[in-house]
């Protein structure tokens, strides 16, 4: 049923407890993505408990339970259809360390819904998520101003939050005029599939409509092949099977490929998606593939697969443009935090701070600053402590973005401007 519809990866972002999971649950429930036998089971329980929102409650319980067990939900549970697209929710993070997922998850997102609770307005993570989504190249946003029921559907409160969020968006180059701000109550179901009588003052699109009005992402199939490895399995009778998402390019059965930085390579014997063999894989496909002559020790998470004649770049050092989101003191040359780029996590040293920039305009404020701090943007030279694949963002945007983590938080986000190869 989904093959004929274009596919979109959707990130649902925002501050903890602002209603991200409830919104995902509501979207799935309204889109009919809850299996019938589950609905039946809950109908029985709901009858006994006198609750009517049984199926919705089921979605919420399963999301909550999966979150508490610390596992991500099976992909089948996290997909839903709108008239035009079918969506996969790539991440619905709830924890401080969600950023890790956001870097690996949001870099795969074509669009994001930012959930901001009306009673609270903009909070610390709201800011962090907006910055990160921009850095990670998400340029389509929908803003859900949620929990409107908690502010009695007040238009004044809605306008106040719109104002706050617009200010942030402008600061990093989004145009708020092109972004829908939708007053919602995910829990009550207001303005999700149809306009709510409780917000007669709101005339814009509802969430489902806004999702359908997103632009279809361009498939970067003409770029060189790049598949960051998420994991590698050993399957009896087949051998080593790396799995990952095709970011750019096309891989066909019989192609000669290489895994960098290790350098092992061979011929593609088979490609599988959703447990079915396919002749070729395109950007956005989550696949497993088997390469002749590749053993268990030749490939690991963080490696990148490409064609032998155009292999992924391995950086001896690289120049990055970064925005410092938060840091308790100041950052100087010599700082060695962990860089998260595609599926790799590698400690890298900032060997020089080259320029300090105005984060709004990108103009140079200072050459060779002695330090940079939260709120600063900068151009820096970076040396990975071990071999690492990264590409200039102008050449392969999907492999040019990174986040810098330290002390359990995202210190900075950035993009690679140029690579000095090993």
Swiss-Prot record:
Location of region: G1: 14-21
Annotated GTP binding sites: 14-21, 91-95, 146-149
One Pfam family from the record: GTP_EFTU
Binding site for Mg(2+): 21
The species this protein was found in: Methanosarcina acetivorans (strain ATCC 35395 / DSM 2834 / JCM 12185 / C2A)
G3: region residues: 91-94
HAMAP family documented for this protein: EF_Tu_A
Enzyme class label: hydrolase
GO-annotated cellular components: cytoplasm
Stated name of the protein: Elongation factor 1-alpha
Annotated ranges, domain tr-type G: 5-221
């Amino acid at each position: 049923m989904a093959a004929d519809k274009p596919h979109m990866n959707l990130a649902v972002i925002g501050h903890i407890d602002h209603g991200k999971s409830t919104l995902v649950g509501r979207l799935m429930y309204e889109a009919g993505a809850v299996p019938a036998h589950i609905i039946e089971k809950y109908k029985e329980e709901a009858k006994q408990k006198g609750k009517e929102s049984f199926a919705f409650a089921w979605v919420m319980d399963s999301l909550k339970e999966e979150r508490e067990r610390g596992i991500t939900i099976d992909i089948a549970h996290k997909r839903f259809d709108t008239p035009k697209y079918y969506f996969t929710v790539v991440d619905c993070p709830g924890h401080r360390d969600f950023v890790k997922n956001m870097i690996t998850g949001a870099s795969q997102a074509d669009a994001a819904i930012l959930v901001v609770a009306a009673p609270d307005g903009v909070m610390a993570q709201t800011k962090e998520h907006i910055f990160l989504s921009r850095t990670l190249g998400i340029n389509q946003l929908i803003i859900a101003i949620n929990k409107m029921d908690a502010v009695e559907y007040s238009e004044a409160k809605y306008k106040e939050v719109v104002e706050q969020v617009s200010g942030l968006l402008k600061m990093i180059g989004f145009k708020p005029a092109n972004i829908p701000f939708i007053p919602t109550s995910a829990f009550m179901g207001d303005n999700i599939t149809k306009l709510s009588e409780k917000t007669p003052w709101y005339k814009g699109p509802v969430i489902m409509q806004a999702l359908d009005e997103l632009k279809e992402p361009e498939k970067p199939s003409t770029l060189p092949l790049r598949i960051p490895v998420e994991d590698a399995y050993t399957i009896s009778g087949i051998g080593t099977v790396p799995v990952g998402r095709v970011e750019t390019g096309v891989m066909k059965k019989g192609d000669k490929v290489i895994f960098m930085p290790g350098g092992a390579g061979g011929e593609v014997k088979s490609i599988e998606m959703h447990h079915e063999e396919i002749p070729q894989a395109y950007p956005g496909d989550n696949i497993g593939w088997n390469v002749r002559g590749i053993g268990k020790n030749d490939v690991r998470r963080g490696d990148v697969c490409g064609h032998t004649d155009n292999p992924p770049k391995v950086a001896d050092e690289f120049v990055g443009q970064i925005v410092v989101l938060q840091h308790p003191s100041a950052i100087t040359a010599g700082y060695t935090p962990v860089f998260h780029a595609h599926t790799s996590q590698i400690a890298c040293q900032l060997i020089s701070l080259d320029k300090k920039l105005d984060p709004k305009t990108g103009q140079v404020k200072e050459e060779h600053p002695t330090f940079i701090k939260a709120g600063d943007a900068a151009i820096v030279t970076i040396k990975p402590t071990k071999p690492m694949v990264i590409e200039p963002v102008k050449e392969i945007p999907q492999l040019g973005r990174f986040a810098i983590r330290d002390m359990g938080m995202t210190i900075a986000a950035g993009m690679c401007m140029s690579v000095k190869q090993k």
